[in-house]
Amino acid sequence: MPPDSTVVPEVRIRDADRSQGALLAAARDEFAEHGLGGARMDRIALRAGLNKRLIYYYFGDKDALFQAVLEQTYREIREEEKTLRLLDLEPVEAVRRLVAFTWQYYLAHPEFLTLLNSANLHRARHLHESRRARELNSPLVETLAAVLERGRRQGIFRGGVDPVQLYVSIAGLSYFYLSNSHTLSAIFGRDLMTAKARNERLSHMAEVILGYLLQEPPA
């Protein structure tokens, strides 16, 4: 019996997906360790265990590969955020959950922070060129806007809060602390990355954000 003609194309597709996935994972580690300028295509190929020519075949050049890594990086965090099901929670709990998730995700994925640092060094031109990156972030803004509006209607949250500004504040409170933990620990003479310090930071961030959002009771 002749082989099914659909088998070979399906195998090739699976092989291509595996190869691209391996290259993206290797590139993520290389860019996180060396930045865009210091990353080397031969090291990426070596990390992935694949021929360097496949990088150019699938991605074109180093800039396009870096853009693909950034897109994947945002896709991963946005997919994790979806599992929070923020719209199923009461507004205050939804905000607390998002603050905690952001903090814990950054702790678990230090490469996320270093990749963003590298992207910012290049004025985020790779993200400016990526429609996909903007599409990935839009649902988060819409979800946060819905949480804020529900809280406003319930008389819990103040009105007029920009969901983008709020998310920047949530992310920034974690990002600055973790990106600068070594220098901050040195200049203040205390280890800001102990378990106790991390727990205190999380509580502080949640109170800062909710302190801004919560509607003051009438006098």
Language-model segments: residues:
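Generic hydrophobic, amphipathic alpha-helix propensity
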Residues: 19-27, 44, 69-73, 77, ...
